[in-house]
């Protein structure tokens, strides 16, 4: 900082101190120290975070050490259950239940249209997730909920609607919406980690050629260019790995699962290329490269 009337480096200390903004200086110093020692702590403890750090400053001031606590989420340990067995059991049970429902409906002259005797993809994913043992880091759930809330706010703004109006229309409080998002986040994260572990356990692999073929099949002229981006390529790869796992399970179950036409499969591939990779997928890519 330069003080008027004094050459650089020759101004009295008391005048220099008066010209400075203490809050601004402290903020810059804290930011610099956190950035330096946070990275060092990760390397020293061999930690690979999958979330942004939650920083708490516990000591900072003149003539005292700078101390802070950084809380991060790491990939949880996942113990898979016998999901193929539980999926088969659920599929058999659903077929038996549907048979009874159809018999009852026929006797009562009701429609059979809404009675389904096949497992659907989301039910298979639920079984894989629910049969697994894992503990999802609270900080990761909070981060996911914050992302859902931000997305909701953006959607309301695009409709020229305030959040208060949305809440009144839904007859809900912000806390209730956040509670619903918390349940959704826990469910989605559980499924994500369980599927990733199942893919790893079954040694499912996706080649570069398969990723390129997916890009071509999407019908998007920009798709081949998009997969040159490492994050997009990793995201598409993860979608194809999941599809391979589910296809393998469906083939084993035979007629106990709902049919998926080639048209729907191509649609899913196209969507995988059009969707923007999430923060998690980018972090996972960094982790994979370590």
Regions found by a protein language model. Name each.
Residues 1-290:
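FKBP-type peptidyl-prolyl cis-trans isomerases
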């Amino acid at each position: 900082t330069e003080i008027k009337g004094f050459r650089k480096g020759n101004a009295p200390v008391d005048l220099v101190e008066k010209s400075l903004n203490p809050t601004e200086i402290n903020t810059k110093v804290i930011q610099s120290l956190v950035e330096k020692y946070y990275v060092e702590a990760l390397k020293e403890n061999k930690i690979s975070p999958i979330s942004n750090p939650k920083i708490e400053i516990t000591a900072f001031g003149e003539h005292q050490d700078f101390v802070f606590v950084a809380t991060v989420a790491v990939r949880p340990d996942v113990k898979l259950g016998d999901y193929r067995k539980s999926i088969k059991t659920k599929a058999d049970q659903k077929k038996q239940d549907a048979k009874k429902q159809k018999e009852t409906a026929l006797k009562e002259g009701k429609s059979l249209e809404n009675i389904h005797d096949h497992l659907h993809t989301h039910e298979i994913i639920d079984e894989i997730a629910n049969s697994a043992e894992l503990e999802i880091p609270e900080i990761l759930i909070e981060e996911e909920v914050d992302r859902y809330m931000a997305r909701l706010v953006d959607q309301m703004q695009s409709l020229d609607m305030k959040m208060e109006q949305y809440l009144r229309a839904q007859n809900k409080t912000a806390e209730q919406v956040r509670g619903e998002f918390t349940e959704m986040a826990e469910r989605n994260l559980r499924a994500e980690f369980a599927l990733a572990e199942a893919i790893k356990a079954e040694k499912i692999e996706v080649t570069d050629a398969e990723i390129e073929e997916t890009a071509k099949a999407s019908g998007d002229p920009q798709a081949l260019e998009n997969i040159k981006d490492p994050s997009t390529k990793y995201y598409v790869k993860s979608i194809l790995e999941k599809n391979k796992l589910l296809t393998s399970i469906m083939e084993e179950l035979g007629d106990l699962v709902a049919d998926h036409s080639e048209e729907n499969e191509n649609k899913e591939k196209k969507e995988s290329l059009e969707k923007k990779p999430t923060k998690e997928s980018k972090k996972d890519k960094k982790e994979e490269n370590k």
